[in-house]
UniProtKB/Swiss-Prot annotation:
A Pfam family that the UniProt record links to this protein: AAA_lid_3
Organism whose genome encodes this protein: Lachnoclostridium phytofermentans (strain ATCC 700394 / DSM 18823 / ISDg)
SMART domains found in the cross-reference section: AAA (SM00382)
Cytoplasmic compartment spans: 1-3, 120-577
Entry's Gene Ontology cellular component terms: plasma membrane
A GO molecular-function annotation: metalloendopeptidase activity
Localization annotation: Cell membrane
Protein name as catalogued: ATP-dependent zinc metalloprotease FtsH
Membrane-spanning intervals of the chain: 4-24, 99-119
Membrane topology label: Multi-pass membrane protein
Source superkingdom: Bacteria
Length: 577
């Protein structure tokens, strides 16, 4: 409110100054010679004269035209004021500021105040920073490791950190020192922040949490100052957990550029490194960083003595997903038809945050339908809302031809999945467009696996190409559409990795072009193109042999708009019989 008050006040002052300036500038000024001035005096035409002793000009106003100011050279003679007064002319030679100078002073004060307030509000909020940290210390220390479902390995690796904070003597007796820093890395939404909070809670120490972006400002030196202030606050607690989320905002590899933004980031990073190096006297303080991109961090940040321990917090497997769903599901009224085990199976590649969002969306669906329980239908709607966005309500603009193209395209993906990777579970095939712009989508659930085989990669590329193949097979080569653009992009990325990263190609052998810093030559690009054409032709042959199945799936898809994996199985089984 105080900031808004100052903004309004400055705006009003500027507006008033502008009005005064415009009024002042609206006064007409004309030059007059001194002889003409004397003639006007002798004819009693002069109303007033304004001047100061050292002024080079006089400002004269006539009785006949008081809206015009005449500028007359100042003769600077003795008794000039008496000469005018004896002729009943008003004389103003007071040492007062002109309107122009008054306006200039007002503008200078206003602009100066505005600059001061801007610097104060955006440059150095160390006190509010510490106020937030103190608030986190009281309010956030509620999460325990038991509240973090899944990530058993990560929780196990932070266990000794907690024990070290609580009983440092047990370790120091054996000459062990506590890791100065712990780096939690992994995809977004996997529970890195929760684990950091749990460490502080389990150890019973204050928790100071800030985001890396809070330290980076446009003014060089502000970020470094905030780092020092935060660490000084933590040191007063003797034992504490300092958590810096999105640490890559300040910890990226230092560039050679000398721009101001790089100077600020480098100074902030140097301040962080210095503070961590001086922790030998503060054995109860541990710094925890979190990032989605470990590979972008500066080597100096990850060396021993800084962030000694690096812990991956990955996506949950099926058992962890089941635990996470149960954790959040216990807080909601789930119906008897909601099977969390099946849901865990269908949510491959979901993070913990996505699983929480899934059940939250299901609860919203149930509330919208005024249901007392979250039913399986609500979970299904929420699942596809999270994956592809809400269904488009108004579909009147979609022509029958576009609908048919979408149906054949999605049926092509589904059929190729069934033929090439039958181990994958087809969850849903739909031609209902979403608000995210998708005309339809095909959702297949792969099995949890650490690796992909050569066959799986090539089959995945063929499945991506199958949508375009189906379009060409049914509508002709000249009628293929832009609907496969995203499929082609994904297939190209997979093929490049297949050829230059995984060493699976017979001709290229065990050589990766990644070491060449992505400087691909023409031969490599031609090889990618030829390999893609070969996979396309193989897919086209497969779809031609099963064209009848493609048409059957498409017809039912056009009729029902959405099909499940069981429907695809039934159609394939019927055709086989």
């Amino acid at each position: 409110m105080k900031k808004l008050y100052w903004i309004i006040l400055i705006a009003v002052v500027l507006a008033c100054s502008g009005i005064l300036m415009s009024l002042h500038l609206s006064v007409t000024k004309e030059e007059m010679t001194y002889p003409s001035f004397l003639d006007a005096v002798n004819q009693n035409q002069v109303a007033s004269v304004q001047f100061k002793e050292n002024d080079s000009t006089l400002k004269v106003i006539l009785n006949s035209d008081k809206d015009t100011t005449y500028i007359v050279p100042n003769p600077k003679t003795e008794n000039f004021t008496e000469f005018l007064l004896l002729r009943n002319i008003k004389v103003d030679n007071s040492d007062s500021y002109s309107a122009t100078k008054v306006i200039q002073i007002i503008l200078i004060i206003t602009v100066g105040t505005g600059v001061f307030l801007f610097i104060r509000t955006s440059g150095g909020k160390d006190k509010p920073l510490m106020k937030d940290a103190a608030k986190n210390k009281k309010a956030e220390n509620r999460v325990k490791l038991g509240d973090v479902a899944g990530n058993a390995e990560a929780k196990s690796m932070v266990g000794d950190i907690i024990d070290f904070i609580k009983e440092p003597e047990k370790y120091s007796a054996l000459g062990a020192r506590m890791p100065k820093g712990v780096m939690l890395y992994g995809p977004p939404g996997t529970g890195k922040t929760l684990i950091a909070k749990a460490i502080a809670t389990e150890a019973g120490v204050p928790f100071y949490a800030m985001s890396g972006s809070d330290f980076v400002q446009m003014y060089v030196g502000v970020g470094a100052s905030r780092i020092r202030t935060l660490f000084n606050k933590a040191k007063k607690s003797e034992k504490a957990v300092i958590f810096i989320d999105e640490i890559d905002a300040i910890g990226k590899k230092r560039a050679r550029s000398t721009s101001a933004s790089n100077d600020e980031r480098d100074q902030t990073l140097n301040a962080l490194l210095t503070e961590m190096s001086g922790f030998h006297e503060n054995k109860g303080i541990v710094v925890i960083g979190a990032t989605n991109r470990l590979d972008t961090l500066d080597e100096a940040l990850l060396r021993p003595g800084r962030f000694d321990r690096q812990i991956e917090v990955g996506l949950p497997d099926i058992l962890a997903r089941k635990k996470i769903l149960k954790l959040y599901g216990d807080k909601k009224p789930l119906g008897d038809d909601v099977d969390l085990e099946v849901l865990a199976k269908n949510t491959v590649s979901f993070s913990g945050a996505m699983l929480e969002n899934l059940l939250n969306e299901a609860a919203i669906q149930a509330a919208n339908e005024k249901s007392s329980y979250i039913q399986s239908s609500h979970v299904d709607k929420a699942f596809y809302t999270v994956i592809a966005g809400s269904p488009l309500q108004d579909r009147s603009f979609i022509s029958e031809k576009d609908k048919s193209i979408t149906a054949y395209h999605e049926a092509g993906h589904a059929l190729a999945t069934k033929l090439l990777q039958p181990e994958q579970y087809i969850s849903k095939v739909t031609i209902i467009p979403s608000v995210k712009g998708a005309g339809g989508f095909n959702l297949s659930i792969p099995k949890d696996s650490l690796y992909q085989s050569k066959r799986q990669i090539l089959c995945s590329i063929q499945i991506l190409l199958a949508g375009r193949v189906a379009e060409e097979l049914i509508f002709g080569e000249e009628e293929i559409t832009t609907g496969a653009s995203n499929d082609i992009q994904k297939a190209s990325a997979m093929l490049v990795d297949y050829l230059n990263k995984y060493g699976m190609d017979d001709e290229m052998g065990l050589f990766s072009t990644v070491v060449l810093e992505d400087q691909y030559d023409t031969d490599f690009l031609n090889k990618c193109r030829n390999q893609m054409h070969a996979l396309y032709d193989t897919t086209k042959k497969l779809m031609t042999e099963n064209k009848k199945l493609l048409i059957e799936i498409t017809n039912e898809l056009l009729e029902k708009e959405s099909l499940k994996g069981e429907d695809i199985d039934r159609i394939c089984l019927k055709e086989a019989v």
